[in-house]
């Protein structure tokens, strides 16, 4: 079984926001956001940063990763 990479669905619930709301804010198809929420696909890191900003959380709060490579990329994105 594939491990969940992101926590977008969990954070949306915590913030009382919907997939549809997030899709509208990002100008994305709701089906795309749904795939992110079920971890069947992942947003790119730039989009993930936008999601974090919209939800008022740190980008790391959206990830379930102990993978140093992913964490390193997140640090680079945050600093740019």
What are these regions (language model features)?
Residues 37, 55, 63-66:
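DNA major-groove recognition helix of helix-turn-helix
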Residues 10, 63-80:
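Short, charged recognition helix plus adjacent turn
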Residues 22-23:
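Short alpha-helical "recognition helix" segments of helix-turn-helix
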Residues 27-43:
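Recognition helix of helix-turn-helix/homeodomain-like DNA-binding domains
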Residues 1-18:
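A short, Lys/Arg-rich alpha-helix, primarily the initiator
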Residues 46-61:
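DNA major-groove recognition helix of helix-turn-helix/homeodomain DNA-binding modules
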Residues 19, 30, 45-48:
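Helix-turn-helix DNA-binding elements, focusing on the entry/boundary residues of the two helices
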């Amino acid at each position: 079984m594939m491990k969940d990479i992101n926590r977008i669905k969990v954070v949306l619930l915590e913030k009382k926001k919907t997939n549809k709301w997030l899709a509208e804010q990002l100008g994305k198809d709701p089906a795309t956001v749904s795939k992110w929420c079920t971890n069947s696909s992942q947003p790119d890191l730039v989009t993930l940063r936008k999601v974090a900003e919209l939800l008022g959380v740190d980008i790391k709060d959206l990830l379930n990763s102990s993978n140093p490579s992913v964490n390193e990329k997140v640090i680079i994105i945050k600093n740019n």
